[in-house]
Amino acid sequence: MFSLQDLCRKNLFLPLEPLGKHVVQRLGLYWEGHGSVKRVGDCFICVDQIWILSIHKAVQIAASEGNEDIVKLFLLWKGSLQYAIIGALEGRQYDLIQKYYNQIGDCHQILPLIQDPEIYERCHELNVTCTFQCLFQHAIRDNMLPIFQKYGEDLNGNRGMVQLLYEMACRLQNYDIIKWIGFNLHVYNLEAIFSIAFVRKDLTLYSLGYMLLLDRMSTVDRNFISIITRHLEYASKKGLFDFVLESLKYGGQVDTVLFQAVKYNHRKILAHFIHEIPRETVEKLILHAVESRASRKTFNLLLSSINYCVNPFVKKLLHAVVKHKYMLIIKLLLERPKKKINLVDAALFKLVKYSTYKEIVKYMDEFSVDPKRVVKMAARLMRVDLIKKISNDAWEDKLERIKHLKQMVNTMNHRNGKNLLMYNIHNITGYTHLNTKEAFNLTKFYAVHNATCLFKEMCKSCFEHDKIQLRELLEDCLHIANRHAYIQIAETADECIKYIDLITPK
């Protein structure tokens, strides 16, 4: 419970002049050595009707002087108990400390308010259970460098604590203390600063890390070069452009940066360096972009730097496209408004040669490729499986399929490819009924293309049809064979004609 006097003092905002000095003193509103005190709002006081002080500063001064009554008054006026403790520590007023400290209970709450390192240390000592480690940790939080300067020698040899305090200072971005620890104590894992700098995206902390590193090693040191390379890889991977530039000040290869920038589509980094590097490097980056499945914008940036000229490395490019099954660059070159570069067929040939049926079908759908082109390529490359699957999918009707396969044979020059297509036709006809016209047409087709074995097979099959018509067909085939010097076809046709003549009644 407040006394009546306390209630009056707490809520008195009136001018003190009419009250007289005696009444002011009786009310406890006189501060020895300073004069009368009057409350001004909630945060200030007026001293001797002239000076304005904040209530916290006033209670600190009163406590340092040990004026318990005035301290009590200022606390009534919403002065801070924490500042009262600080003032008592400054004046070594231990009676006041003992009286008020228990109301706070934890000295650590007061530490951030203290600027004087000596008072800071005294305050920390109020908690008798605290250790030096605790003092150092709070000194980091409150940027109290003099504590380290005073007791730093006690940390020598304690590697664990030094590392802990160093990393804590890095996390709290206390640069002054980081520098002091880094230059004056042995930190066994100095590189921890870089990991924290990356997480917090703190370039100042990052630069400070290099300053500390270079205090221990030179830029030509193998370990330093390895560290720089790792940093460049990570910074470019995360798109931290300023960090990349900072690392490059101390060494490292731009190529390291560019390959990561391509892989993770960081075009700002790429655009900064792309016009400063040789064409050979750009070509390697484009191949890497295919492997990394880079974005459309990344590809356009790379291609524009070489004016979309891919001829010098087109074989390598096609190999990469097929190997990694990523066709975006083929589309981009085809989509150019002027001077389109068509690599569809070239890539298709590689795909047909090395890829699976599903991959080829996907490519056909993507670029609207005619199945005939694929089948003919498959025939030249002896991909029997592809001929069958793609022709089956493209032309479900067997007669339609035979018709298209025959057209392909007619337009092919590759001998082995033609033979493969004709054997495929023959396999279809093995389980397909052909009428007389279809059978005769196919027989003549085999004769025209010098498919001896298939011609013989068809001749045997045709004996079930009209013999007179068959004889006429065979005479045509014999004429074709003689004209082109197809000896075996001619012999077979001649034998069949003689046999028909033999079995036909006269």
Curated annotation (Swiss-Prot):
Keywords: Early protein
Transmembrane segments: none
Pfam families for this protein: DUF249 (PF03158)
Transcription listed as a keyword: no
Protein's UniProt keywords contain Endoplasmic reticulum: no
Induction of the gene: Expressed in the early phase of the viral replicative cycle.
Sequence similarity: Belongs to the asfivirus MGF 505 family.
Primary role: Plays a role in virus cell tropism, and may be required for efficient virus replication in macrophages.
Protein name as it appears in the record: Protein MGF 505-9R
Biological source species: African swine fever virus (isolate Tick/South Africa/Pretoriuskop Pr4/1996)
